[in-house]
Amino acid sequence: GRVSYEKNIKAFLEMETPGTKVVCGVGPLEEALKSRYPGVRWLGLLPRDELALVYAAADVFVFPGRSETFGLVMLEAMACGTPVAAYPVDGPLEVLNASEGAKGGVLHADLKQAFTDALQVPRWQARERAMDFSWAEAGKLFQAYLVPARSSS
């Protein structure tokens, strides 16, 4: 990921939580944040296979962004069985399917509360929600819209 202002990573770093905080990625705020938060494990930019191992080893993936239009990293984490904690804003609302009870993670205006609650989300549920975004599911959705369009012309 990108360690930059718009990712709101400070919200994650300032949370008091059990365990070790891990940050993957590089960016303009990286050096300043490294010196301010020395207890955080900074892994830099990782190859996809290593990143998948980091996702799978995490108890919760914290997505502190408030301005993402989608947030593919949430799906990547959930595909590895890691529940997501996020603010209830556009990207996470769609990815976690807020209209059906936020499957695969927890949305909350208090990010620490989202984190705490996400610890209780079963890992299989996170993975199952990620599979809703597979190419096979995308194809089904596309076909569902094609048929009504053909019959109305």
Residue ranges and their predicted role:
Residues P83-A86, N97:
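Short hydrophobic beta-strand element within catalytic cores of glycosyltransferases
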Residues L53-A58, F142:
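Short alpha-helical donor nucleotide-sugar binding micro-motif in glycosyltransferases
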Residues R2-E16, P28-A32:
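A conserved mid-protein helix/loop that constitutes part of the nucleotide-sugar donor-binding site
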Residues L13, G71-M74, P92:
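Short glycine/serine-rich donor-binding loops of glycosyltransferases
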Residues R66:
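Aromatic "clamp/platform" in nucleotide-sugar-dependent glycosyltransferases that forms part
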Residues L119-P148:
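A charged, aromatic-enriched C-terminal amphipathic alpha-helix characteristic of glycosyltransferases
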Residues E30-D49:
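Nucleotide-activated donor-binding/catalytic signature segment of Leloir-type glycosyltransferases, i.e.
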